[in-house]
């Protein structure tokens, strides 16, 4: 390619175009080439007198000066819009000429396409406050738009021209029914008009979603709309409130037997533990809004109510002097029954709060059955040696009459003053003081107590980490190094100090 020399030392092409000697860029004239070379040299000859900003072109400086004077010379003749740049005004005028017939009546935003309006209404807070669907049908999606929309169209349509019609295929079912006969409308499905606006727009939005919108968004929003009727505050709900939120089938199995316990009147239990387990599992699977530990709420109350059923209905005397048992007939022990229920339910029957009835003896609580994941879990105050001594020396006190059937001997239960207690006997988890923890706003906070150490946790994760420190066979055995503490104080000191025994690798 032959290049000629232009005046001023510029290299000119045969087509009378100039080229940059640094990067080879082709320019149509000397002024364009001069401005381009300033990008290589860094020269900015035009500088603002007020803020010191410099520019390569004078037009950029003049546009910048308007920022200081707040001057907006370009104004729209159809509305009050004003701007500093001509290209911005031209883009604004296109919104009037092209038109946005789909307008949201809750925030006055307009869109050119119906799908854009539906996508906006998924985020519009005013739309989700819930107005009647008839109001939306008559206003938001009327044939020619709302009155405000028609007034907007009158500025831009030509004389004698009809306003643009909305696509009939995009109308909602409610809009189609507006022209039906009233007698036919009464024969339609009663719940048709009561369909939520969110469901309608979500279905339509799924069919006309943009390719850039993830498909996963729809499933999450649908799930939130379907669970809108479930109101549950897990942080502030007490035991009684959580039990009242259990649906009817499970409430019938839990609250009816419990009522007989508080009224001290015998009531036969007609539902087995297997039915209670089945209903509880069905509740956990069908009600995702309920807490994940609903089984720990229902099962202790059910086991306690069956426990008291044998206390009232069986020939066993509940007097404080002792147990009178008919010879030749075996009666199941309440403690053993409660333990079997806890095993059947797949979760130990632990007490949630203080659910012991007022007329129940102090030594007998909702957690008198073997609980926790530790089979030998006993009182937190007793030492390991004392517990082993009780297990070896309580054989005479736990001997049963000859009339009893050959049930396996339970060394962890013993008879003491007419009551069946745990071996450690002295104190139970129900004898621990009950604390009500409140936040700064006065609302009750949910706590997670450790019945071994007497600690309260506000976070379930910290509670789980702490319970993992207790051993499986002995709660005061360190689950990290196997060190066996004498009491809870030594165990807490061992965990806090981190003085773990070296493990053989």
Curated annotation (Swiss-Prot):
Cystine crosslinks: none
Keywords attached to this entry: DNA-binding, Metal-binding, Nucleus, Repeat, Transcription, Transcription regulation, Zinc, Zinc-finger
Protein name: Ikaros family zinc finger protein
GO cellular component: nucleus
Sequence ranges of Polar residues compositional bias: 262-273, 309-327, 366-377, 424-439
Record GO biological process: regulation of transcription by RNA polymerase II
Start-end of Gly residues biased regions: 336-345
Comp. bias (Basic and acidic residues): 409-419
GO molecular function, one term: RNA polymerase II cis-regulatory region sequence-specific DNA binding
Organs and tissues of expression: Expression is strongest in the blood, gills and intestine.
Location of this chain's protein in the cell: Nucleus
């Amino acid at each position: 390619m032959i290049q000629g020399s232009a005046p001023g030392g510029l290299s000119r092409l045969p087509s009378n175009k100039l080229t940059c000697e640094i990067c080879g860029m082709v320019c149509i004239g000397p002024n364009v080439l001069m401005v381009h070379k300033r990008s290589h040299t860094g020269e900015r000859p035009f500088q603002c007198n007020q803020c010191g900003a410099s520019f390569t072109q004078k037009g950029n400086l003049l546009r910048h000066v308007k920022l200081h004077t707040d001057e907006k010379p370009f104004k729209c003749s159809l509305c009050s819009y004003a701007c500093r740049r001509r290209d911005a005004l031209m883009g604004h005028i296109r919104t009037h000429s092209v038109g946005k017939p789909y307008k949201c009546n809750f925030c006055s935003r307009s869109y050119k396409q119906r799908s854009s309006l539906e996508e906006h209404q998924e985020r519009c807070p005013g739309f989700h406050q819930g107005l009647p669907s008839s109001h939306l049908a008559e206003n938001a999606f009327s044939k020619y738009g709302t009155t405000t929309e028609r007034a907007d169209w009158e500025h831009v349509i030509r004389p004698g021209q009809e306003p643009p019609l909305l696509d009939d295929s995009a109308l909602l079912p409610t809009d189609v029914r507006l022209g039906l006969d009233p007698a036919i409308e009464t024969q339609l499905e009663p719940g048709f008009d009561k369909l939520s606006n969110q469901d309608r727009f979500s279905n339509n939005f799924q069919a006309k979603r943009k390719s850039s919108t993830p498909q996963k968004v729809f499933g999450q929003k649908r799930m939130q709309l379907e669970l809108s009727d479930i109101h549950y505050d897990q942080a502030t709900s007490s035991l009684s409130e959580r039990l009242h939120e259990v649906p009817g089938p499970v409430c019938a199995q839990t609250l009816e037997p419990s009522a007989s316990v508080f009224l001290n009147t015998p009531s036969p239990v007609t539902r087995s533990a297997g039915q209670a387990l089945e209903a509880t599992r069905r509740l956990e699977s069908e009600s995702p809004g309920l807490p994940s530990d609903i089984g720990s709420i229902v099962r202790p109350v059910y086991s306690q109510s069956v426990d008291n059923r044998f206390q009232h209905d069986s020939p066993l005397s509940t007097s404080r002097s002792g147990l009178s048992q008919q010879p030749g007939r075996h009666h199941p022990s309440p403690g053993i029954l409660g333990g079997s229920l806890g095993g059947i339910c797949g979760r130990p029957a632990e007490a949630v709060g203080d659910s012991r009835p007022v007329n129940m003896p102090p030594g007998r609580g909702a957690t008198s059955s073997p609980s926790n994941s530790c089979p030998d879990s006993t009182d937190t105050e007793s030492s390991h040696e004392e517990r082993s001594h009780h297990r070896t020396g309580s054989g005479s006190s736990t001997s049963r009459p000859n009339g009893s059937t050959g049930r396996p001997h339970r060394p962890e239960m013993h008879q003491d003053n007419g009551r069946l207690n745990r071996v450690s006997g002295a104190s139970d988890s129900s004898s621990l003081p009950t604390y009500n923890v409140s936040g700064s706003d006065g609302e009750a906070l949910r706590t997670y107590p450790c019945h071994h150490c007497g600690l309260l946790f506000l976070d379930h994760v910290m509670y789980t980490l702490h319970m993992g420190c207790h051993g499986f066979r002995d709660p005061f055995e360190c689950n990290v190094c196997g060190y066996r503490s004498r009491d809870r104080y030594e165990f807490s000191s061992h965990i806090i100090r981190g003085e773990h025994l070296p493990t053989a690798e």
